[in-house]
Each structure stands twice: as C-alpha cells, then as structure tokens.
Amino acid sequence: MDRLARRLMVALAALMVACVASSGASSNTIAECFSDNNERRIAGCSALIDNPALDAGTKSLAYAMRALAYALKGALPRAVGDYDMAIRLDPTSSMALNNRAWVLFKLNRLSEGMTDVERSLSLAPSSPHAHDTRAHIRQALGERQAAMRDYEQAMHFGGEHLVKLYQCGLEAAGVYNGPIDGLYTSDLRRAFETCVGQPSCDPLPADEECRAATS
C-alpha cells in the first residue's frame, strides 16, 4: 500500500500548489510536504498546517500527507490522529478515508477500517487503492471470495502496473512463479486464491521490492 499511496503524490502536489497560491506558503515548503524523505515531509507539512491563511481543504491535504509520513515511519497511532484531522476538515476526502482505513487495518482495527474504506469507495468507486484496502481487510476477516473480488477490481481499475505489483508480491510470497508481465492469467488467479487463504500472505510486495519490474 505504501507504493500505491506514493503514486498519488505527484497529482496531489500539483493540486496543493494551485490551492496555496494565495496563502503565502513557499513552493519549497510545498515541495517538502511531498518529499520522499519522511522527516522533510513531516516538517514541510507541519509548516503548511501552521499557516493560518491556508484553506480547510488544503490543510486537510497537508494533514493527510503528514499522516502518510508517520505511517511509513511506523508511527501508526500518530498517523491515525492526523488522518482524523484531515477527515474532520474534509469529510469527502476519499484518499484520507482510504489511507486511514489502511492504518486501522495495520492496527488490527478491522471493523473501523472497513467503515472507512466503504465510505471511501462510496466517494471514489473506481479507486484501485481502496479496493486493495478492502481486499486486505476482507482477507484478514476470512472473507475469501469477497477479498478475491476486491483484488480483481483493484487490478481492473489499477491496470497493468498494479497487476505487475501483485505478480511481484505473490512471487515474493512464494505462491507465484510466472512472468511479471501485467496480465491477469489463470496462474495468477490460482496464486491469489492460495494467498487469500492465508491471513499472513500479502500480495503487495515490500516497498523497495519490484522497483525495476514495475517501473
């Protein structure tokens, strides 16, 4: 999910630049809020959050980006707190709702995570990220068929890149040995079915794995 979340950052950065044009925030501060370095991201987003001229929607985005940095550092309770603020400021942020659902999943707060991801999908029904989150929650709950449906929806909306990511993750999990070609085949489906039957199996690879194969 970390890799999925990072794919949103370029578009969100462009959106934030447009939103803060009249707030007095520097372009460097905005860039820091979207840095790949978590400490710089926390500092940049904190500066934006403290800017009294920032509108609620943009401040919500800054909280969400700082929350992502905390989550990537493993500070999950702090991430939840920032996502709480992001959603309070913008209750229609499907991204913040989905990302909070993911953190709640990581904290084994599955029912709360399911509530969030359902809200996220009601706002953005074609989000591959949210379908992936719900698939993980359903897998953890033992809802194998429902989890499979969501993984398939995630691939449908996420396209070749996400299929490759799953292929690489399932290969790393030891349940798939086919090509990393972005095609959803019967072999890949069988690998998914095996993985979904194992609560500890994650079809997403570790963050630094598969970079070359999926680029």
Protein language model annotation of sequence segments:
Residues 51, 55, 89, 123, ...:
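Structural marker of alpha-solenoid helical repeat scaffolds
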Residues 56, 60, 94-95, 128-129, ...:
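Helix-start (N-cap) detector for alpha-helical repeat units in TPR-like alpha-solenoids
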Residues 72, 106-107, 140, 172, ...:
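Register position in tetratricopeptide repeats
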Residues 161, 171-215:
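Short acidic, glycine/serine/threonine-rich helix-capping segments at coil-helix boundaries
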